[in-house]
Amino acid sequence: MNGEAMPEMPMDILAIQKCIPHRYPFLLIDRVIELNVNVNIVAIKQVSISDGVLAGHFPGNPVFPGVLIVEGIAQAAAVLGHLSHPDGLRQCYLTEISEARFRRPVVPGDTMVLNARIAKRRPPFFWFEADCSVNGEIAAEVKLSAYIK
C-alpha cells in the first residue's frame, strides 16, 4: 500500500474523490463498503431516475447503459489500484475491456454492487476481473486492464 492511511469503511464520496479524479456527473460510485488492499473492492452505485443519462436511455423504459456499468466498475478498480499501488495513483488509464457480458437490465431503484478483484499485476499495469450485481443477481461481468502510474 502507498504511504496514505487506510480509509475507514465505508468510504464516503469525499474519501473516494481523494482516490480518483472523477467528479459529478461522471463519478459513478457512491461509496465503498469493502476494500482489501492488493486483493479486491466492493463499491455501491444507487441508480436513480434523476440520473441524467436515463432521460434519453430510453424514454418511457429507462435502462442504465451497460457502458456506464463498466465505467462504474472501472472507477471502483481505480480506487483499489490507487490504494494498492506503492506510490499511490496519479493517473489511471483503462487499457483493455474484454469478455464483457450483460446478464440483466439495471433500472432506476436498483442498487449496483460493483466488485473488482486484482487478477494480476505488473506495475504499472493491473488486470482486474469484475462484476456488477443487483439483488444478488449478476447484471454484468467484465475483465479490465489499466495503466496506473
For the regions a protein language model found, what residue spans apply to each?
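HotDog/MaoC-like acyl-thioester-processing domains
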Residues: 8, 37-38, 42, 106-110, ...
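Compact, glycine-rich, soluble single-domain proteins
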Residues: 48-51, 55-81, 94
